[in-house]
Amino acid sequence: MKKHTVLLKDRLDKIHVLSAKSGTPLRKFLKENYIPQDSILCYVNDKITDDQSYIVKENDKIVLDMVRAYQLPEYCRTLRLWEDDGVEVTQENTDSIYTKRILWFKENGICDLKQTQFNEDSFVKYIDDMFVQGILTKSLIKENDKIILALSGGRDSLALLYLLRRNIDKLPKHELIGVTVADTAASGADVKVAAEAIANLGVRDYTILPLSYVNETMHFINGFENVIERVLVTNGRGRSITLWHTIMRACVERFAREKGVFNLSFGYHFEDLFTSIFRTYTLGILLGESAPLKTWGEFTHVSPLWTITKKELTLYLNIVAPEHHSKQGSPTDYDRGDHNRDINYFIADLLSGVWPGLGFNFFESLERLYKNYRIESPKYDVCDNCGITYTHAYGDDLDNRKFRHVCNHCSYLIEIGEIPLMKSIE
């Protein structure tokens, strides 16, 4: 296909020359060049044309007239979203395994793209330093803390274990109590890997909660396997994944109460927290007073991986861990989200691509909102059936529970006959 000239005219009457292949849908060209559909009007041979249906033709005169005043071309070149003559040629670095990019705003409002390349050794040091700095700056671990460490055996919780082991001398003295909810959607192989890794860390107090513990916690009539399969088949992946995570957290909270320890640590990384905040903003609720450290009823949730992305965790494990610890199998049917969940991760990843480091702005904005506007903490209750701590932050208008003495999931399970209306008194 021949290349064809497309002219982009900005609000300062500057003309930017782009090229598109004949036969290409213009909507595809716009997406490939990071030109938002609603930022331009399309003129073909001086006539307004629908940019979503037009196909680029060789002899047509195509002009994209920006209706927005921001400097799209300048921004795209700064971020290297456009790789044309206005962008410095990228020099190959065969030693580099990773480039960290952050969009940095100066006091005059102009932004710069800061980026650093890492080889294997410098990358491991960078992740170790980010991990320690993230814990110390937010006081996630204090001297003589006891922390319940929830482990699935997946890549995120394994990376957390390796980071704790490698940097233990740089952190305040603390005691870890490991727990894995086994025989549910977690595979036997994952549980084995979790046990190996926690032994390497030197954690003496580690418990694998069996299926009987799960069924006892939830008061299932027909058992976990039947319940989760029924929910998956009848209500889909969105319901089954949230139910599974609720079951695991209910078991972890029960275990923590039995231990008398109320600091809970999960393997939530940068995107998990960024996505959670993004989703709560779209729903009109707030995640908590802080992304890496938040109050949840009688518990405190600690997320030591908050500064590190999933990609960085994966690379880190590939370097520092044996192969059978760095590999991750496909998620089970019960651990796959639906579109309502996945689109939030997708949008968060896209936003990080066009605004590198945006997630950190979200984290700080959440803390400022709570501090400056003195937002009241949501009301928390404890489910009469499973014992999980839950919030009323969604509001009464979205509360569809038929049975108000239990959490949303247990109310639903009572309705379909998978748990009794009232748990037995021991």
What spans do the regions from the language model cover?
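Eukaryote-biased recognition of intrinsically disordered, low-complexity regulatory segments
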Residues: 1-18
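ATP-dependent adenylation/nucleotidyltransferase module used to activate substrates
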Residues: 12-14, 30-32, 36, 48-50, ...
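A broadly conserved sequence feature marking short terminus-proximal activation segments
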Residues: 13-15, 19, 39, 50-97, ...
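Residues immediately within or flanking Cys/His clusters that coordinate Zn2+
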Residues: 108, 116, 380-383, 404-407
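Short, cysteine/histidine-rich loop/knuckle motifs that typically chelate Zn2+
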Residues: 121, 385-388, 409
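Catalytic subdomain that performs nucleotidyl-dependent activation
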Residues: 272-353, 415-416, 423-426
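Short functional micro-motifs and their immediate structural scaffolds
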Residues: 391-392, 412-415
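Short linker/helix segments within small regulatory modules
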Residues: 394-404
